[in-house]
């Protein structure tokens, strides 16, 4: 019987594919961690706590670092999905984990579809219901396509970079008190543990933890020989997430510090949208729509 030739792990094509999968995993984790829920929470907590919320951002990044490093290393070294690892450790627990992640993913993605609808509404004025339907159909088409793998990798990277650049633009437009924000990051006037728990639960828990690591499994970047590359990618991913979170916080802080009162309690409240619009006018609203979508 003919045997398959072993993969040359020093060939330029293998190295290029591995680098591509690592970069895609980085941005998949980053974009998953900064969805409609986090954007809305950041706007709400910044409006109520001001610069002191910077400490909550820092705490979420530190916790994120510990969790993501552990999960990425274990999953890629064992070459097993999280539910399979859990079943090996405690028989039956993997099924419970899978059910919890599926349920959490369903709840969060209902929010993501709603956020996509609101994003298209802010970006082009489309009715949020139709925006959600069109976004869901587009997602189904992309993920059901046989040729979607490489397209998804490229799309994730491009959209992640666009998200950072657009938020940077709004941040500079809002002119936040950066010095005060940096001070409050390490020496906050107030520490709200409920706020920190909410932010951490929405950005570290659930399927977000496993998105990047499972993407590496799909691309074959596994084994002890890849541990250094995986650890480096996890660190870079956390840095990208942290950068994006802090830029978003500063963009909204600039608006709040200027004296603008954001509506965070009414039925139609959309504090993040208000902040972007106050910072950069109609352009800011369109940018918010694109980021949310």
Q: What do these predicted regions represent?
A:
Residues 16-21, 50-53, 88-95, 124-131, ...:
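Membrane-interfacial loop-to-helix junctions in multi-pass transporters
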Residues 20-37, 170-256:
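Hydrophobic, membrane-embedded alpha-helices of multi-pass small-molecule transporters
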Residues 21-63, 69-70, 266-273:
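Transmembrane helix-boundary motif of multi-pass solute transporters/channels
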Residues 25-29, 57, 61, 95-106, ...:
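Hydrophobic alpha-helical transmembrane segments of multi-pass small-molecule transporters/permeases
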Residues 26, 98-99, 122-145, 159-171:
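Transmembrane alpha-helical segments of multi-pass small-molecule transport proteins
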Residues 29, 56-89, 96-104:
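Juxtamembrane transmembrane-helix boundary signature
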Residues 77, 94-125, 132-136:
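Hydrophobic transmembrane alpha-helices that form the core helical bundles
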Residues 79-93, 247-293:
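TM-loop-TM module centered on a large, flexible mid-protein loop between adjacent transmembrane helices
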